[in-house]
C-alpha cells in the first residue's frame, strides 16, 4: 500500500518520457530525441520530483502528451492527422481538470492553433467547446458524488489562488523569483545548453511557451518550484537539441591497408559536456532524493512498524510540527488516532493558524493545547522545537524514544536537523 502509488506514478512518468522523446523526434529528429531523453533522465529536479505523487507530476505528463498532438507545433500542421487535435484537446482538458492553472499553458497553445488552423469556427465550436464541456461536466459530477453538493472546484481554485491571492497565505516571493532562483535551480547546469538549443533550433513557439508560463506565474505572489514543472521538460528538450549539435560526428582521415580511409570521430566537446552534466546533476539527484529531509519518511516508517509490533503501546499520536510535515496515514495504514496542527487559511489575514502559533511560541502553545487535549501516547516534533519543549515534555511524563536525521541545512524555516519521537511513560 505504501509503494503502490509511487510505482503507479513511475509508470505515468515513463509515459511522459516517451512523449518527450516523440515530440523531440518530430521537431528535431532522432538524434535530438535521444539526447532530450538523456537530459530528462539526468536532470536532478526531474529525478527528484517527477515520480512523486503530486498533481503537478501528472499535469507535466499530460502536458507532454498534449503538446505532441498539437498541429500548430508541427513543421507541417496541415499534414497532421485530423484526430490528433482531439487527442491534444482531451489531454489538455484533463490537465486543467486536475490543475486549473494548467489553463495558462493552453491559452498560449490555443491562440497559436487558432492562428494556424484554416477552419477557426470548427476548431472552437466543434472541438474545443464539446471536449471542454465533456471533461468539465464529468468533473462536476465527480465532485458532486464526493462533496454531496454541487461544487465548482475549478472556479473556487481560481478564486482562491488568483482573484483573492489566497496562496500568499503560505508565503510570497519577489516577482523575479522564477527567473533568478526557481526555474534556474531546476534547470541547474542544463541552463547554457537550453539557451543554446533555443537559439540554434529557432523553435520560437515552444521557447515562447516557457517564457509565457514563467511570466504569468511570476505575477502571483506565492511561488513554488513544482508550479512550473510542466515546462521543465521543454527546456530540457532544447538541451537535447544542443547536445545533438555538439555530437555531430567528424570524419577523420586514417591509413587503411596502405591507402587512405576514414573513421568516425566523436566530438570531444560532447564528451566533456556529458561528463559535466553527469558530475553536477547525479550527486544533487541522489542527495535530494535520498538524504535531504528524509526524517519525515523515516519516522512514519518507524511508527508503522511499531504499531504492528505485538508489544505496541501506540494508541494516539500528536504531531507538533508544521502541518503536512509527514506522509501521515499514507504510510501508517493503521486505524490509530492521529492529529496535527491546523493550517487552514483564514479569511482574516491577521489571524494566525495553529501551526504559526506553535512556531511563534512553542512552549506557550503547547501549554494551552495540553489543557484540553486527549493525552497522546506519542508526540512527534522537530529538534528545533524540542529544545524549547523539553521541560514541558518531561513534566507531562514524555521521554525520548527515537531520533531520526532530517536535514543538513534549512529551507524555508529554521534548521530542522532531526525529527524526534517522544513516548508517554506511566509513573
Model-found features: residue ranges?
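Membrane-interfacial loop-to-transmembrane alpha-helix junctions, especially the N-terminal start
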Residues: 201-209, 270
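Perimembrane helix-loop-helix junctions
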Residues: 68-92, 102-136, 249, 257-262
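Specific aromatic-rich, kink-prone transmembrane helix
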Residues: 39, 58-77, 87, 234-238
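Transmembrane-helix motifs of polytopic, lipid-linked glycan transferases
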Residues: 7-28
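Short helix- or helix-capping micro-motifs
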Residues: 36-44, 92, 96
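Short acidic/glycine- and proline-prone juxtamembrane loop motifs at membrane-interface regions
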Residues: 45, 51-58, 225
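Membrane-lumen/periplasm interface segments of specific transmembrane helices
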Residues: 95-171, 176, 181-194, 206-207, ...
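Membrane-embedded, lumen/periplasm-facing catalytic core of multi-pass transferases
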Residues: 251-378, 405, 416
Amino acid at each position: 500500500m505504501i509503494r503502490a502509488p509511487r510505482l503507479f506514478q513511475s509508470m505515468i512518468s515513463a509515459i511522459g518520457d516517451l512523449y518527450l522523446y516523440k515530440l523531440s523526434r518530430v521537431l528535431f529528429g532522432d538524434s535530438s530525441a535521444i539526447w532530450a531523453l538523456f537530459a530528462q533522465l539526468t536532470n536532478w529536479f526531474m529525478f527528484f520530483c517527477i515520480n512523486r505523487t503530486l498533481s503537478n507530476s501528472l499535469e507535466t505528463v499530460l502536458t507532454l502528451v498534449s503538446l505532441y498532438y498539437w498541429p500548430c507545433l508541427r513543421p507541417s500542421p496541415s499534414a497532421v492527422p485530423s484526430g490528433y487535435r482531439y487527442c491534444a484537446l482531451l489531454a489538455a482538458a484533463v490537465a486543467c481538470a486536475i490543475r486549473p492553472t494548467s489553463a495558462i499553458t493552453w491559452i498560449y497553445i490555443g491562440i497559436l492553433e487558432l492562428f494556424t488552423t484554416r477552419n477557426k469556427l470548427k476548431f472552437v465550436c466543434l472541438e474545443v467547446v464539446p471536449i471542454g464541456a465533456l471533461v468539465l461536466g464529468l468533473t462536476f459530477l465527480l465532485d458532486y458524488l464526493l462533496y454531496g453538493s454541487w461544487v465548482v472546484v475549478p472556479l473556487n481554485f481560481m478564486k482562491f489562488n488568483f482573484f483573492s491571492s489566497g496562496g500568499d497565505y503560505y508565503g510570497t516571493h519577489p516577482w523575479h523569483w522564477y527567473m533568478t532562483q526557481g526555474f534556474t535551480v531546476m534547470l541547474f547546469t542544463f541552463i547554457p545548453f537550453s539557451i543554446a538549443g533555443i537559439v540554434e533550433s529557432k523553435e520560437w513557439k515552444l521557447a515562447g511557451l516557457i517564457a509565457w508560463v514563467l511570466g504569468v506565474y511570476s505575477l502571483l505572489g506565492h511561488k513554488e518550484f513544482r508550479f512550473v514543472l510542466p515546462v521543465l521538460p521543454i527546456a530540457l528538450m532544447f538541451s537535447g537539441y544542443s547536445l545533438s549539435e555538439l555530437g555531430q560526428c567528424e570524419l577523420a582521415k586514417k591509413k587503411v591497408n596502405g591507402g587512405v580511409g576514414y573513421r568516425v570521430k566523436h566530438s570531444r566537446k560532447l564528451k566533456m559536456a556529458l561528463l559535466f552534466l553527469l558530475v553536477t546533476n547525479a550527486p544533487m539527484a541522489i542527495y535530494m532524493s535520498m538524504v535531504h529531509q528524509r526524517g519525515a519518511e523515516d519516522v512514519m516508517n518507524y511508527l508503522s512498524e511499531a504499531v504492528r509490533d505485538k508489544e505496541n503501546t501506540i494508541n494516539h499520536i500528536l504531531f507538533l510540527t508544521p502541518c503536512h510535515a509527514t506522509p501521515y496515514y499514507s504510510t501508517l495504514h493503521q486505524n490509530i488516532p492521529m492529529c496535527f496542527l491546523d493550517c487552514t487559511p483564514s479569511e482574516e489575514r491577521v489571524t494566525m493558524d495553529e501551526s504559526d502559533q506553535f512556531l511563534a511560541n512553542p512552549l506557550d502553545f503547547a501549554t494551552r493545547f495540553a489543557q484540553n487535549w486527549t493525552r497522546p501516547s506519542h508526540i512527534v516534533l522537530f529538534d528545533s522545537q524540542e529544545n524549547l519543549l523539553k521541560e514541558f515534555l518531561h513534566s507531562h511524563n514524555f521521554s525520548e524514544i527515537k531520533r531520526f536525521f532530517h536535514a543538513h541545512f534549512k529551507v524555508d524555516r529554521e534548521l530542522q536537523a532531526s525529527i524526534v519521537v517522544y513516548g508517554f511513560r506511566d509513573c
